[in-house]
């Protein structure tokens, strides 16, 4: 009986720890969906900026506010579609979402500046709009912007105004490969 009680106590403690950590970081709102992970890697790059470098003004709120070009390689054959998320993990009130795109043909190897491929859908960003919203940190701050590309092994069913959390939940257990490119922007 003691072993059973210890197991139950251990399970309760583990559940409590998971429950407490699941709610961390979102600025008081609902807990963010976990980021899907995969064993295979997609290479993500841009002709507009290098890993860790400054995102061009053109792709920010201070410029034309158009998405930068993205190139990706290593997409596995089992991919049904690609998904792109752009997030600012340095935002003062938790991760700020700048772009949510799904339905990209897995044979695409690039997105041009300001382009959205045929058949792709854009979800709701943290500005409350569908589409790309460029980096726009508070004056005097420099933030990181994570451009994530996911290869989904099944096409997720999502509403037209899906959020990044909706997309992440749909990708759990369906992510064949994943890659990121991080850029910076300061004002």
Each language-model region and where it sits:
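N-terminus-centered regions that define maturation/targeting leaders and the start
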Residues: 2-187
């Amino acid at each position: 009986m003691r072993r059973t009680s210890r197991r139950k106590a251990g399970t309760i403690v583990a559940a409590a720890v998971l429950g407490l950590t699941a709610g961390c970081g979102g600025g008081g709102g609902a807990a963010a969906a976990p980021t899907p992970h995969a064993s295979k890697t997609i290479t993500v790059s841009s002709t507009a900026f290098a890993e860790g470098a400054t995102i061009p003004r053109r792709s920010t709120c201070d410029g034309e506010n158009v998405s930068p070009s993205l190139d990706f390689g290593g997409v596995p054959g089992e991919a049904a579609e690609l998904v792109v998320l752009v997030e600012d993990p340095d935002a003062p009130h938790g991760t700020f979402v700048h772009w949510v795109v799904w339905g990209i043909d897995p044979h695409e190897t690039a997105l041009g500046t300001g382009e959205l491929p045929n058949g792709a859908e854009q979800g709701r960003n943290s500005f409350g709009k569908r589409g790309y919203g460029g980096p726009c940190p508070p004056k005097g701050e420099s933030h990181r912007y994570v451009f994530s590309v996911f290869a989904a092994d099944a096409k997720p069913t999502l509403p037209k105004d899906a959020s990044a959390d909706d997309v992440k939940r749909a990708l759990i257990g369906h992510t064949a490969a994943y890659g990121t490119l991080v850029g910076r922007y300061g004002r």
